[in-house]
């Protein structure tokens, strides 16, 4: 272990350098004409659009905190970005809506929709891993359940939820499109679709929970070190960081076309 530490540290240092070099591509407030705006939160839907709830009084705008995250993004943006990136529109609504919600809740975080989408791609192929699909209602079907963390090829993590979240009362398993551990979901689980419950298998709930988790600790994700710290808190390892980074950069580039 000691002999490998310098290599691992060098890898992380190199990755941080890459993040700092491409931060304009991956994260909000980019200055690059090629990707300007691609990594920032998408346009917000107007109150008059059919997908948004009716205002309480004439001319009033709905409170974004009370609107399901999937209804927050502009429909035309979703259609165009889904076509250019290949991310299914229903799932893209969850990523983009969660980024918009965090723009209101924690504006200093500056979370790009493409960072959420990159994690979703790496963790579950946008909810399609092992033959699962995300339904029009936003639910992964069949439910996405990760491997048992039994100490084999993965770290050992004994059951923390009596199997209530992951169906395994011996070992913990990551669940849902964003692959939350039961103990993490217990703390960060969110209700993104406004149905009164937090469901890790629902892409809106999972995306909003992931957004809040990444932004905690007053991080500014336009800063390379903060971005790396956020991804590290989600899943450690320079290889994982590099995969998420590549996905985030690719999605931003595709969306800008």
Regions found by a protein language model. Give the residues of each.
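Catalytic glycan-binding domains that act on GlcNAc-containing polysaccharides
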Residues: 71-257
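Compositionally biased, intrinsically disordered low-complexity regions
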Residues: 13-19, 39, 61, 140, ...
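N-terminal export signals and maturation junctions of secreted/periplasmic proteins
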Residues: 27-103
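Hydrophobic single-pass membrane-targeting/anchoring helices
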Residues: 2-38
């Amino acid at each position: 272990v000691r002999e490998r530490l310098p290599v691992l540290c060098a890898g992380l240092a190199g990755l941080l350098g890459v993040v700092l070099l491409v931060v304009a591509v991956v994260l909000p407030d980019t200055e690059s004409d090629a990707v300007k705006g691609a990594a920032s939160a998408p346009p917000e839907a107007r109150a008059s659009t059919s997908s948004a709830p009716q205002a309480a009084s004439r001319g009033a705008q709905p409170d974004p905190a009370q609107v399901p995250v999937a209804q927050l993004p502009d429909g035309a943006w979703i259609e165009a970005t889904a076509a250019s990136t290949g991310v299914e529109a229903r799932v893209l609504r969850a990523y983009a809506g969660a980024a918009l919600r965090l723009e209101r809740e924690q504006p200093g975080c500056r979370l790009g929709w493409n960072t959420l989408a990159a994690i979703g791609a790496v963790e579950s192929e946008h909810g399609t891993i092992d033959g699962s699909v995300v339904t029009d209602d936003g639910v992964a079907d069949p439910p996405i359940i990760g491997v048992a963390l039994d100490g084999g090829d993965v770290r050992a993590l004994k059951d923390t939820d009596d199997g209530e979240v992951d169906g395994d009362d011996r070992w913990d398993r990551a669940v849902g499109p964003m692959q939350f551990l039961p103990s993490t979901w217990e703390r960060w689980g969110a209700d993104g679709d406004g149905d009164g419950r937090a469901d890790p298998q629902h892409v809106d709930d999972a995306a909003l929970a992931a957004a809040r988790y990444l932004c905690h600790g007053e991080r500014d994700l336009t800063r390379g070190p903060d971005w790396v710290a956020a991804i590290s808190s989600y899943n450690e390892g320079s290889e994982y960081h590099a995969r998420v980074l590549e996905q985030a950069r690719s999605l931003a580039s595709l969306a800008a076309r």
